[in-house]
Design a protein with these regions (language model features):
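Active-site-adjacent bridging/hinge elements
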Residues: 35-43, 65, 98-102, 126-133, ...
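Short, glycine-/Ser/Thr-/acidic-enriched flexible segments
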Residues: 46-48, 85-86, 181, 190, ...
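N-terminal, positively charged nucleic-acid-binding surface of large information/translation enzymes
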Residues: 2-232, 256, 273-305, 324, ...
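Extended, non-catalytic structural segments that build the interaction scaffolds
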Residues: 5-6, 109-117, 260-278, 372-388, ...
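Phosphate/diphosphate-binding loops
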Residues: 315-340, 732-735, 810-818
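Short hydrophobic alpha-helical segments that form membrane-spanning helices or hydrophobic packing faces
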Residues: 170-172, 224-226, 354-355, 468-470, ...
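Structured ligand/cofactor/substrate-binding pocket environments in proteins
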Residues: 55-67, 74, 83-84, 152, ...
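Feature 926 captures the class I aminoacyl-tRNA synthetase adenylation module centered on the KMSKS loop
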Residues: 199, 394-459, 464, 506-549, ...
């Protein structure tokens, strides 16, 4: 193709045309006919918020690189896209948009609001994903709010219930007062907080004194069921077995002992209330203490709080502290740092409440989960320990019921006669118990039921994604299960990874995937995690519009799995500069390519063999790096090769062969075409738009590149000796080019004579023509040994700042002497005697500056350039 038809500069706006081409051609369709090895990616289903953020970009670039690399290596890749629709984020957004709470409208109306918003957001995110060049097979898209996926989730519930792995019980659970729902421990985040530690006197019931407790939760005084001290704490040995009265409430509670009390914290006296934290739960269970509910689902005090009933928690805390002060019970307050558990969605501090909820029996399966996790490949491998540590820390089962609306309904009714749990048949699924009735009577014969109104934790949908993409339980699901790869962030190892291994293993007896690649978080340029509140968020569209998706993909790929990644505009600009440099190289090469480019190398030009050796070594490095999921290593190797070896060195070294019709011209064209085509293919998983765009100009169909287009490795081209000899020639060429540049000599101006000295002329005798013609040298010689040179001093000047102060009235004599004598003779005297005497004084080398030139054995003035292996002499151009 003529260069007249190719834009002068790289135009990233062509990316949109390629997106349309890939969709139109079904380039990334999963075939599934067994004719190729399959590679299955268990793609994360994001919440449909309507916007991709940089964390999405990073995660999906990782998996897209892998998908593209595998397709290019003739794998049949299943790269689906799912949407985890249900849960709090959508409900919270709907409440915000419509200025309502979930209970202000009917369940059906609220659910419809959520569905409409979700559909809109999914469509927005689909478009953004396509702009990024992600190669999902959109025929394998799943949306968790659709009936077929609700059926799958509910079926998994029935199967685990029938295995006694799901049960209902009254148990302490984590509760979010803002979202008004139970949440699992994995959904609790911890943030640092400074609060007041309040020292409060509890009077002994027998009047013998006080027990001073230290608490950060005085609002829970009404729910205090005991006071506890360490059995070996001698300060309180006289209190063992006694009772104390609660301030304000005047109710008596026992003083008990427990070895888990920290005597160093506060006063060493702790009140047990229901419930301040998990330790309270353990003590209440251990000592069979009463449970007093003090806070309701909205985070307001219950009637047991007396005059504080109806107050929000913070308001009650403030009021009760004031009353404790007034009544003389509050001894002092001091600041204390603590980790507060908050809801991971709305960041509201969680409360522990006792509720009847549905649970998955996790604790009985932790050993199985760890065993399955160990059998998988983790990249990086230390991420496995996050899951192992989480599994070993589990002391509560997974609470899966939620008091929300927009989620998969729990498929349960309760018989109004015998109160048994009634389940639907598998054929009836999916069901909404608030709308549907079971398709059979209760075992007692009753046909009157009360529906379960709670819904399932959204992780119940997303923790079976390997089964979802396999179309479980429909025939043939086993052919694409388990998945090959689970790509995900390290922040959801304890949720998505843990729950998926648990549920899929419980349902199938097999692990859900073979490998996990873990990505980190994205940080802003200020070094903090990207956050709206910090104002450091960069929207992907802002980068794509200005620099294109491939520049953003290059930034993403230049990172290490598991590590957090800082965003930097300078990295984006550098990536774009790289693409423009390669584009310019392509335009130059294309100008010289024609239908006569040979199919193979016919000559022995070392520079050609040098670049082909380095090209195939690059192929090997990049292939190994992709197999190891080390994208940064692959990208950096490509950068270095394209920028330096190919553009800066090889192209410059062969230009003369392209402009002259000589024997080696055809080989130069073959080599240029081979290098650019191979490099574009190696880059294609990272920069699919750029590689496809240029490849089409070079005559390759889009599918040829993306399907089966990974370049063949030619080991026979890799030659250490060739690379060494080629590097010698490149070093000399570089030195001569730099010399011309630094001396203001045009690159196309002839150099008269260049003499090269070395210990072994064989190192460069095969590359003399390339050195000579690349640098426009008229005469070039190569000799063994070192050059015979002498340094000639051509001028000498006194250093006035030293001569004046030191020699005072004699300074003029020294200045006159230096000006009137041959600088070469003065230099010889200084070298021989160390000084020159002028009248009553003498000066040394430290009193003068000199300018010298090198002179060859035959008297010519020369410049010398040095590399590690060579001395290069040039006659000074007059």
């Amino acid at each position: 193709m003529s260069n007249n038809d190719i834009p002068k500069d790289y135009d990233h706006t062509t990316e949109e045309e390629l997106q349309e081409l890939w969709q139109r051609d079904n380039t990334y369709r999963f075939i599934g006919d067994g004719t190729k090895p399959t590679y299955i990616i268990d793609t994360p289903p994001p919440y449909p918020t309507g916007k991709l953020h940089m964390g999405h970009v990073l995660n999906w670039v990782y998996m897209d690189i892998i998908a593209r690399y595998k397709r290019m290596n003739n794998f049949d890749v299943l790269f689906p896209q799912g949407w985890d629709c249900h849960g709090l984020p959508t409900e919270v957004k709907v409440e915000e948009i419509h200025d309502i709470k979930k209970n202000d409208v009917s369940r059906e109306t609220f659910r419809d609001y959520c569905i409409d918003l979700t559909h809109d957001n999914i469509e927005k995110m689909r478009l953004q994903m396509r702009k990024m060049g992600y190669s999902q097979d959109w025929d394998h898209e799943y949306i968790t709010m659709l009936p077929e996926n609700k059926r799958r989730t509910q079926l998994s519930f029935l199967k685990l219930y029938n295995k006694d792995m799901i049960y209902q019980d009254i148990h302490p659970i984590n509760w979010c007062p803002r979202c008004e729902t139970a949440i699992a421990f994995a959904e609790v985040e911890y943030k640092d907080n400074t609060t007041k530690l309040n020292y409060v006197n509890f009077p002994a019931a027998d009047g013998s004194g006080n027990a001073t407790i230290a608490t950060t939760r005085p609002e829970l005084l009404c729910a205090c069921v005991a006071v506890v001290v360490h059995p070996d704490d001698e300060r309180y040995s006289n209190l063992h077995g006694k009772t104390v009265k609660l301030p304000i409430y005047n109710r008596e509670v026992k003083i008990i002992t427990d070895e888990t009390v920290d005597p160093e914290y506060g006063t060493g006296v702790v009140m047990i209330c229901t419930f301040g934290d998990k330790t309270d739960v353990e003590w209440v269970t251990r000592y069979d203490l009463d449970i007093i509910d003090a806070i309701d689902e909205k985070g307001e005090m219950l009637p047991v709080a007396g005059k504080y009933a109806g107050m929000p928690i913070k308001e009650c805390r403030k009021a009760i502290i004031n009353d404790l002060k007034e009544e003389g019970f509050l001894i002092k307050q001091e600041d204390v740092d603590q980790n507060v558990g908050v809801c991971w969605r709305c960041k509201t501090p969680i409360e522990i409440m006792t509720k009847k909820q549905w649970f998955v029996a996790v604790k009985n399966m932790t050993e199985d989960i760890i065993e399955q996790a160990k059998s998988m490949r983790w990249v990086p491998d230390h991420m496995y320990h996050r899951l192992e540590n989480w599994a070993n820390s589990m002391d509560w089962d997974w609470c899966i019921s939620r008091q929300r609306i927009f989620a998969t309904p729990i498929p349960v009714w309760y018989c109004n006669d015998c109160h048994k749990v009634v389940l639907p048949s598998e054929e009836q699924l999916p069901v909404d118990p608030t709308i549907d009735q079971p398709d059979h009577a209760c075992s007692c014969g009753c046909t009157s039921f009360t529906p379960e109104e709670d819904v399932l934790d959204t992780w119940m949908d997303s923790s079976i994604t390997p089964l979802t993409i396999a179309d479980w339980p429909n025939p043939g699901w086993e052919t694409v299960y388990p998945a090959t790869l689970r790509p995900q962030g390290h922040d959801i190892i304890r949720t998505w990874a843990f729950y998926t291994i648990l549920r899929c293993y419980a349902l199938t007896g097999e692990k859900p995937f073979d490998e996990l690649v873990i990505n980190g978080m994205v940080f802003g340029e200020d070094g903090h995690k990207m956050s709206k509140s910090l104002g450091n968020v960069i929207q992907p569209e802002a980068v794509i519009d200005e620099y294109g998706a491939d520049a953003l993909r290059l930034w993403s790929a230049n990172s290490v799995p598991g590590a957090d990644v800082p965003f930097g505009w300078k990295d984006i600009k550098h990536a774009y500069k790289f693409l423009r440099k390669f584009w310019n190289a392509f335009r130059f090469i294309n100008m010289h390519l024609d239908e006569n480019v040979p199919e193979e190398l016919s000559g022995d030009n070392i520079i050609d063999k040098w670049i082909l050796s380095k090209l195939n070594r690059l192929n090997k490095v990049v292939t190994d790096a992709f197999e190891e999921y080390n994208f940064a290593k692959a990208e950096q190797a490509i950068y270095d090769f394209v920028w330096h070896d190919f553009c800066d060195e090889y192209i410059e070294a062969v230009k003369y062969r392209l402009y002259e019709d000589i024997d080696s011209t055809a080989d130069a064209k073959y080599t240029l075409k081979t290098v650019i085509e191979t490099t574009l293919a190696l880059m294609a998983p990272i920069t699919p738009f750029f590689s496809d765009n240029v490849s089409q100009y070079l005559g390759k169909e889009s599918k040829e590149l993306h399907i089966g287009g990974w370049p063949e490795l030619h080991e026979e081209y890799i030659d250490d000796d060739v690379e060494l000899i080629g590097s010698y020639a490149i070093d000399i060429i570089d030195e001569l080019r730099r010399y011309k540049s630094s001396h203001g000599i045009p690159l196309n101006q002839l150099l008269n004579t260049v003499n090269i000295y070395t210990e072994d002329v064989k190192k460069i005798e095969t590359t003399i023509d390339d050195i000579k013609n690349t640098n426009k040298v008229d005469n070039i010689t190569v000799q063994n040994g070192k050059p015979d040179l002498r340094e000639k001093v051509i001028s000498m000047e006194p250093i006035m700042s030293k001569v004046g102060p030191e020699f005072k009235q004699h300074a003029k004599d020294i200045i006159s002497y230096i000006a009137s004598n041959d600088p070469e003779e003065i230099a010889e005297k200084l070298e021989k005697d160390g000084q020159v005497i002028v009248g009553e004084v003498a000066f040394t080398k430290e009193h003068v500056t000199t300018e010298s030139e090198l002179v060859s054995q035959t008297g010519e003035v020369v410049d010398i350039l040095r590399t590690e292996e060579f001395d290069i002499l040039l006659e000074v151009q007059q």
